[in-house]
Amino acid sequence: MSSILIVPIRPVDHAELAALAEPLEASFHIPVSIEETNYLDPSFALDSYRSQFNSTAIIVKILERFPQFNGKILGITAVDLFVPVLTYVFGEAQLDGTAAVVSTFRLREEFFGLDADPKLESTRLLKEAVHELGHTFGLIHCRNFECVMHSSTSVEEVDLKGIEFCGDCREQLTDSTSR
């Protein structure tokens, strides 16, 4: 049986990690655990020119750190992520692979100069975590704007999409997890 391992990447809010476990179990119907001792320091992935962290490099390091893990690995951090061809990303995943990473950096209201909204920010994090893990199960971006697998290039798009898989994506996920 497969499982999901949540890996803290400094800095990270442990309460956010704990709040993710149960909803992720409900979304994927597999056990979720949180790595309690093997934290990842993302400083190796810092691009000092951009003042951002390369999400692809973080995924590679996650895979190096947990080579024997037989499931999906989700890194969670609060640093600003990028891939070289984009200004920023909320997260990144290996398509039909093992690892993904999500950042809360641009999901927080404070980033936009607004007051914190923990409930909204928690919902955003869950949507992006489910989305990136969906990619690790082989799901691609969905055209259904209500589906959690719909691509989001802004926080407004994260807010607009749903928290669940549409029927087609759920069917693909079920096929993937039953293999």
Question: Where are the language model's segments positioned?
Answer:
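Generic structural signal for residues positioned in beta-strands
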Residues: L5, I73-G75, A100-V101, V148, ...
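Fold-level signature of zinc-dependent metallopeptidase catalytic domains
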Residues: S2-V12
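The catalytic-center signature of Zn2+-dependent metalloproteases
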Residues: F112-R179
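Metzincin-family zinc-dependent endopeptidase catalytic domain
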Residues: R10-A129, I140
